[in-house]
Amino acid sequence: MLSKFSGSRQDQQFVLLLVILLGILGISLFLAVSMGSVAIDLGDTYRIILRRLGFPLEIGEVSKSTLAIVWNMRFPRVLLGLIVGAGLSMCGSVMQSTVNNPIAEPYVLGISAGATLGATLSIILGLKVMISLGAFLGAILATIAVLIIASMQGRMTTSSLILSGTVVNALFLAFSNFIISVGANADSVMTIKFWTMGSLAGTSWADLVLPTIVVGTAFLFFSTQYRVFNAMMMGDEAALTLGIPLRFYWYLYVTMVAVLTAVLVATCGIIGFVGLITPHLARGLVGTNYKRLFPVATILGALFVIWADVLSRIIIPNAELPIGIFTALVGAPFFIYIVGGRRREVRT
């Protein structure tokens, strides 16, 4: 009876937390749209967006340029930040469970290095319209290489996955640096530099279609996998004892994470540390049960990228910085904190 009451109370607290986070996310959407090099009244932003979404609100006297900035430029950009942040956070949550390692994130498999190589080749060859396709193909190629190397001894393990990702990451980055050193001009180097640091600039409504479909589908699927994630976090032997076919789920999850990350990277470049930070923040809020952790981490990821993008737009007047700079400034100290915490646990 007591356990039922305790469980019911935890469920109520979890639902309350979700409502609060979703409320913060909704407010953040309007605030983020109103902030930028051209400040827009929050009330105008609110009315323009809701009016365009079909709500019977009067916009009032608003210039055409303000309408264009809000609806055609900033709102799609903020929505893409939400989608990318949610997707990267989902990938991080899944990877940390799949390899049972709290410092794993989507890029641990060398996916970012593969995307960088593909994008670099496209830029150097003058195929700038194919940067996204090149990044996607490079990310998929890197993932295939990781899976092949990890399975070379006949049995893929979490350790072999991590080691293979490290090797592929180093190899692909070396190829990228070689290509840049040999064939890049000043314009190409600047394009590559900005792309590899991530940016949501220039987002249009058309850019939202594919990421929305992929991230939405992945969220629905991964939300049903919490029992498998919880078993994996107990270790390989415990998961096998519970009847979990680890090899099947390793291939399935790694492939899905690779495709999801490749789509996101191809859309906005490389935005690091999102998948590392947000699952840990979620654990601090709701514990390690993936039934609660996964949706909370997803919302936190969306919030993180939205506000990192806002900083990239406003910190320098009339200029814009790559969003990856701000995620790295937060993520690098956080990574050190996690590693330091693990070392203290080992000593004790």
Give the label of every model feature segment.
Residues 1-348:
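Alpha-helical transmembrane segments in inner-membrane proteins
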